[in-house]
């Protein structure tokens, strides 16, 4: 989402700087730290993933989450069969199983993630995919922007007051 938001803003550098400033230059190292800080009251707002926020909600926490107006990205989980696999038929059967409606439902519920199937509804409390402000950027543009975002974020993390 950071990359998509950066692409949707006038200046990626200014966007990162303002975000870091709003976070008091405190950069946590994991979504678990964000969740813990929200639950114990250290933070009233946290920047995290949809799955992490949904985990809090499904666990009964009184939290909500939003997506950046500038946009976000949806990177779906993937499964593959290795070329030259000595057990190709079994691997393809497992692939079919992982993509089945039942398996996708189990994964969505147990991991608070979205199904890769378009015919499987989002879990309770999650917005349908068509309502998300998804970036229209391609993978090459997103990859380049991610590298820039990482560099700018490291610079912001090293500024006065950084964690």
PLM segments and residue spans:
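A ligand-binding cleft/hinge motif common to bilobed small-molecule-binding domains
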Residues: 44-62
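Short, hydrophobic alpha-helical packing/hinge segments within bilobed ligand-binding/sensory domains
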Residues: 34-35, 52-53, 91, 103
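Extracellular/periplasmic bilobal clamshell ligand-binding domains
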Residues: 122-163
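Extracytoplasmic ligand-binding site segments that recognize negatively charged/polar headgroups
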Residues: 1-42
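A bilobed periplasmic-binding-protein/Venus flytrap-type ligand-binding module shared by bacterial periplasmic
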Residues: 4-7, 75-88, 106-107
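Periplasmic-binding protein-like
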Residues: 16-20, 27-28, 59-83, 97-120
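Substrate/cofactor-recognition hotspot
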Residues: 94
């Amino acid at each position: 989402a950071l990359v998509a938001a950066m692409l949707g803003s006038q200046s990626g550098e200014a966007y990162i700087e303002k975000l870091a400033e709003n976070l008091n230059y405190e950069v946590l190292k994991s979504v678990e730290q964000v969740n813990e800080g929200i639950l114990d009251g250290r933070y009233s707002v946290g920047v995290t993933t949809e799955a992490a926020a949904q985990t809090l909600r499904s666990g009964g926490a009184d939290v909500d989450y939003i997506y950046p107006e500038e946009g976000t990205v949806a990177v779906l989980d993937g499964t593959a069969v290795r070329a030259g696999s000595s057990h190709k038929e079994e691997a393809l059967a497992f692939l079919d199983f992982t993509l089945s409606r039942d398996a996708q439902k189990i994964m969505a519920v147990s991991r608070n993630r979205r199904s890769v199937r378009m015919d499987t509804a989002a879990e309770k409390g999650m917005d349908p995919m068509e309502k998300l402000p998804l970036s229209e950027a391609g993978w090459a543009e997103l990859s380049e922007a991610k590298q820039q975002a990482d560099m700018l974020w490291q610079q912001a993390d090293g500024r006065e007051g950084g964690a």
